[in-house]
């Protein structure tokens, strides 16, 4: 048999041994059993492994969690393991016999003095009578093999210890994950409770403001009704006097005029009602997750608008620029669109309006009409308009156009779009309050941000609109 054939036999035996070896004890199977995941182990090895590790039952090889200590005896695998053990023993014995003097052809070898190499001791002229290993060389050979075995056994113990440690870490990891889940659930329960309490406080505030507004409306209604009644009496008396006009009646009318003079100068007024903007705790932190980098699209900007180099701000310039009248450009409205086009997802951005007395920000269809200054059809534009006249400040949403008086100006506006759910909302980004939320509207085409710094209003509205970095 050639050296190549010997090596092939050794390799085959090693491969067979690996297939018939228990994963736990690394020896041939003894009374093997197979778990429900398909892996096989010695019966005693498997039971001992489950006993040593106080964890949910799992496969020692793939760590799959087992529903119950269920396994099947694998008698065929046991018989194969016995055959493999016997076959390996015979092959090793045969190789040992071939190494005995006179039976193995070729030269004989012994260890050199430094034990690092072997030397040929056969006389060149000898035929089949060869020198044998000396007993001293044989002992050295066995000692070296025993040293290797000891090293391998030590290494096996180290690997087994690491494996046992890793199995313990599996349970520890599960416990840590379970604890973290409990903490998350607990913290979110606290947050839910806190938000529920905040919700109740906001509702109570709105109810109080509603009562105050209703009281003002009723009081004004009573005053207007009384004024109408007094005016009616005055009209009736004057009409009666006109029908029977005498000197005495004229004097009576003159006296009545003096008495009702204050009534004539009373101007009827409508009641101003106010509602607080709905403060939402943690609103900005939640919306920041959907922040989108918005820039302006110069191709859509009205010729009177001046855009910054970084395309993050726009103001009214006062002088018409020489720009091409392309189809995308607004020719009458002081408007510019954002460069981003949305067809899905959630998006949030903020716009600094500062101390401007008039402005408009929002979202529109990409197909919105850019020519002329006609009102946009409902569904084409979703915008928020800020307007300050004297000391009165109001916010308007479009379209349809709805107004709301507010106590304080808004300096920074947050715009939120959830395309998939058809939701658009505006927020006061400074105090984290909701300004207005449009009813859900299904979107069927692309949407874009829209901005208008509006006209300068004799120099009182020259500040720019600035898209903020979130």
Curated annotation (Swiss-Prot):
InterPro entries registered for this protein in UniProt: B30.2/SPRY, B30.2/SPRY_sf, Butyrophylin_SPRY, ConA-like_dom_sf, PRY, SPRY_dom, TRIM/RBCC, Znf_RING
Cytoplasm keyword on record: no
Gene3D superfamilies according to UniProt: 2.60.120.920, Zinc/RING finger domain, C3HC4 (zinc finger) (3.30.40.10)
Zinc finger (RING-type): 22-63
EC class (word): transferase
Pathway note: Protein modification; protein ubiquitination
Residues spanning the signal sequence: none
Pfam families reported for this sequence: PRY, SPRY, zf-C3HC4_4
Domain B30.2/SPRY per the UniProt entry, residue ranges: 273-470
One annotated GO biological process: protein ubiquitination
PROSITE patterns membership: B302_SPRY (PS50188), ZF_RING_1 (PS00518), ZF_RING_2 (PS50089)
E.C. no: 2.3.2.27
Expression (tissue specificity): Testis.
Catalysed reactions listed for this entry: S-ubiquitinyl-[E2 ubiquitin-conjugating enzyme]-L-cysteine + [acceptor protein]-L-lysine = [E2 ubiquitin-conjugating enzyme]-L-cysteine + N(6)-ubiquitinyl-[acceptor protein]-L-lysine
PANTHER family linked to this entry: E3 UBIQUITIN-PROTEIN LIGASE TRIM
Functional description taken from the UniProt entry: Probable E3 ubiquitin-protein ligase which plays an important role in blastocyst development. Involved in progression of blastocyst stage and subsequent embryo development.
Name the UniProt record assigns to this protein: Probable E3 ubiquitin-protein ligase TRIML1
Species this protein is from: Mus musculus (Mouse)
High-level lineage: Eukaryota, Metazoa, Chordata, Craniata, Vertebrata
Gene name of this polypeptide: Triml1
